[in-house]
């Protein structure tokens, strides 16, 4: 009886300490002792090769492809025309491959996809991010609103042509069922093929999950940022997709209307919160790694994020427990020498220094709190605790000469710093480790790895 009471007390302390939140194990980081990674996924090759402008990505510990290409060993993104025969209508109204998934051969698509993967990712030991960017239609019928409604209309006409004898209600039901079945097969089987061919990669679809919390334009001060219940329910229905994914790739692109506003943080926070929820429900043994797509400039502009919005995007992403952030950019970044210099100036200023701040702080917390065997995650997801270097204890120093540039972080973690981390963060242990501070081997988890 005494031992039972002790066990109950320990369980109560555990739940109270961690706010009653069950934290699943995490997959070990892509690179050892790097709990939070920053990737560069912008086509800035011309800056280096044509304009001789080095963006100094390595200086600030940013993971990038060779020569800063859009696709390579670190991250490869597949657009609609790059992988298989993806049926869709493009932004200019051009039709491709039967338009709707039920009107195209899945077998032909997978055969072409196999060839494309071998061509674009020749390395069979590919260990980077494999991102499939299919945004033209969504696999759920009810989510094809607005300009995507054309896929519903085409599906209805397709069913009507095949079954003219059916009533209109039956045709609509049939169209929905056939569309969702074919869309699911296209997305699921493409993912399975990619994972079979390049099993060490981190595979998933860009903008999945989404939570459709874009109503900041109409709500103003009434905006909460919360994902609508119906959208969270629809995400639950995509369990088949989450189970086959090996990573999630949501986005937190900020429009300029959100610049340095409370709404920006609400927008980002709830998108991340939903992504972490999905990551924890996909599998029984570990939470999927979440790599969050962001832009270093406001969407549809060439204006850099403010310091406040760097915290809102990069800082919030790290504090919520994501595995990393991926900076996406357009051809505009490398369109002229002036564009390249603008990106470089921002990189050598607020952007680069903040990246060093957060990635180093995440590593320090992992070392100090989680014995290097886990990553630090907010105890209370809605708190304003961030993984930042303590300014009274650490300094970021940049040393440059004619041939190279180095960033050095000097300082040490003081007792009061450690107390702050323990009060505000908890450990999400990597597979193979357990305990409050990931200090114990977990034989059960090791066998699953």
UniProtKB/Swiss-Prot annotation:
Disulfide bonds: 47-340, 211-227, 365-376, 370-427, 429-438
Function field: Snake venom endo-hyaluronidase that degrades hyaluronan to smaller oligosaccharide fragments. In venom, it is not toxic by itself, but increases the diffusion of other venom proteins by degrading the extracellular matrix. In addition, it displays antiedematogenic activity.
SUPFAM superfamilies tied to this protein: (Trans)glycosidases
Family annotation (InterPro entries): Aldolase_TIM, Glycoside_hydrolase_SF, Hyaluronidase
Catalytic activity: Random hydrolysis of (1->4)-linkages between N-acetyl-beta-D-glucosamine and D-glucuronate residues in hyaluronate
Enzyme Commission no: 3.2.1.35
Active site positions, chain numbering: 135 (proton donor)
First and last residue of the signal peptide: 1-23
Organism encoding this protein: Echis ocellatus (Ocellated saw-scaled viper)
Keywords: Disulfide bond, EGF-like domain, Glycoprotein, Glycosidase, Hydrolase, Secreted, Signal
EC top class named in words: hydrolase
UniProt-recorded name of the protein: Hyaluronidase
Glycosylated sites: 67, 103, 153, 357, 401
GO MF entries: hyalurononglucosaminidase activity
Chain ranges of the EGF-like domain: 427-438
